[in-house]
Swiss-Prot record:
GO molecular function: translation elongation factor activity
One family name in Pfam for this protein: EFP
Keyword terms of this UniProt record: Cytoplasm, Elongation factor, Protein biosynthesis
Function: Involved in peptide bond synthesis. Stimulates efficient translation and peptide-bond synthesis on native or reconstituted 70S ribosomes in vitro. Probably functions indirectly by altering the affinity of the ribosome for aminoacyl-tRNA, thus increasing their reactivity as acceptors for peptidyl transferase.
Species for this entry: Clostridium acetobutylicum (strain ATCC 824 / DSM 792 / JCM 1419 / IAM 19013 / LMG 5710 / NBRC 13948 / NRRL B-527 / VKM B-1787 / 2291 / W)
Name of this protein: Elongation factor P
Annotated Gene Ontology cellular component terms: cytoplasm
Pathway linked to the protein: Protein biosynthesis; polypeptide chain elongation
GO annotation terms (biological process): peptide biosynthetic process
Gene3D superfamilies given in the database record: 2.30.30.30, Nucleic acid-binding proteins (2.40.50.140)
Subcellular localization, as worded in the UniProt entry: Cytoplasm
Amino acid sequence: MISAGDLRKGTTFELDGQVYNVVDFLHVKPGKGAAFVRTKLKNVITGAVTETTFNPTAKMQEAVIERKEMQYLYSDESFYYFMDQETYEQIPLSFDQVENAIKYLKENMFATIKFYKGEAFSVEAPNFVELKIVSCEPGVKGNTTSNVMKPATLETNAVVQVPLFVNEGETIRVDTRTGEYMERVQ
């Protein structure tokens, strides 16, 4: 059992026969009245997002989630295909299931697929990925009074903010959890 006060982003639990993943949460302690936890939950089966408020002492059953490392192969008009390295089985996943991770995945990269009762419901990209910059504005000399950032488009079409000294064609390391530039890769 897990209490509502212990909920964090990414926590998966069962409530009223449904399985939810915490998208966002806020622990509120008002000046008057009892504390509560405001959450934004995504149903892992249907994909529906709801906002729910819990008493911090409320208990719910933690869902048993299986994680499996799989290789991203390719995509077509409607699905993204991943392959299990042990069985060579390929599974198609919809955009809703891969939306947070796909902007950091290139073909043949590995990602963690989350399963609930044998059904895939979510994809996690590796924490750090190295991607090439395909387009960005050139840095202007003298424009360095502070930590100035500029947008850069990566080979996966993700856009991240990078420092002025980073140029098109360079490879950078990106933190996929925050979408932030970490460093240049030599």
